[in-house]
């Protein structure tokens, strides 16, 4: 039969006044006593760290007084072992003089009560149960009473006959004795039945104590698991708080980026609207120029027709030339007019004809200028569709608008200043974007530290 360490008796040694409570300062001594009585200890019950933490706790709470159950709970939390189910070393137990507990460990008070009930039961039963040799349940048989058949034959009752004893009284006493014996037998059967019931109840009590003990152990196990789950939940809560803070930082960064994108889109939209307005104005101007060109072409055609008619008219009615006058010849107009030629008119022409020729030449020059202007607009439209926003066009426009100094030294200084400003702008934009995006080459630089404010989680 297994024997276990009497934990309650060890605790009771530190309670001389039998108050049921001991000081917390005796906890480590109790643990050492239990460790000394253990069977085949592989390692001490408390390691250095647990013992140091227990000493610190006892030092801070030296005035605390705890009960035996609280001592057991503290022992279970520190060691993870049930103090009532530790096997005992019999040799060490004899040396210390503490009685072991057998079978399954039970509370000491319940075991003593059960033993007292059993002792009382068997002690009472020894007096109630009748002896086999005596039908009257008495240690000394009543030999003075005999049956009716033995009355006359027994010599021991001769003095009764001589004294004229009453036979009826003897018969009544005998009947009363038999009645009491029957009652005693019935009571004996009742006592046996009660003994059986009591034994059954004791077995049920033992099983209930076993179930209570297992429930207590299971409750301690669940309490330990609950403490571990509570500790894990605290760690998860701290991690969740950290993730929430990082999420808020990411949200703030996203909001700032959205504002920046919105500002860029707004600026781009403004530029697009401006370009659309300029393109619409250019289209309107081009349409107006085309309309004016068509009108001028119609006028030119009409003038050419009139010119042809006038040429034929002058050819028919032209006067004979003088002898000293140069022959009839065609002369070109001095101002540019690639469309037609006006014939030579002699000096005898009228004033109206000279005015008409001057107006015709003016119209021709205006038509030529309008055509040149239309060609320039067509070339400008073709270039604007391809390289209006190209860097070369922007630079050429910028340099065309900037008035550069004539001196060579001033030009060199000006271009050097532009180069330095461009290098600074490129450095700022490049490393600013690289810092936000956290490109790996930044970690190679000695003066650059890792920034984890916007790191993804």
Curated annotation (Swiss-Prot):
Keywords: Cell cycle, Cell division, Cytoplasm, Cytoskeleton, Meiosis, Phosphoprotein. InterPro entries: SYNE4 (IPR030268). Its main location: cytoplasm. The modification Phosphoserine is found at residue 134. It is found in: Cytoplasm, Cytoskeleton, Microtubule organizing center, Spindle pole body; Cytoplasm. GO terms for molecular function: spindle pole body-nuclear membrane anchor activity. GO terms for biological process: cell division; meiotic cell cycle; mitotic spindle pole body duplication; mitotic spindle pole body insertion into the nuclear envelope. GO terms for cellular component: cytoplasm; half bridge of mitotic spindle pole body; meiotic nuclear membrane microtubule tethering complex; mitotic spindle pole body; nucleus; old mitotic spindle pole body. Interacts with sad1. This is Karyogamy meiotic segregation protein 2. It comes from Schizosaccharomyces pombe (strain 972 / ATCC 24843). The gene is kms2.
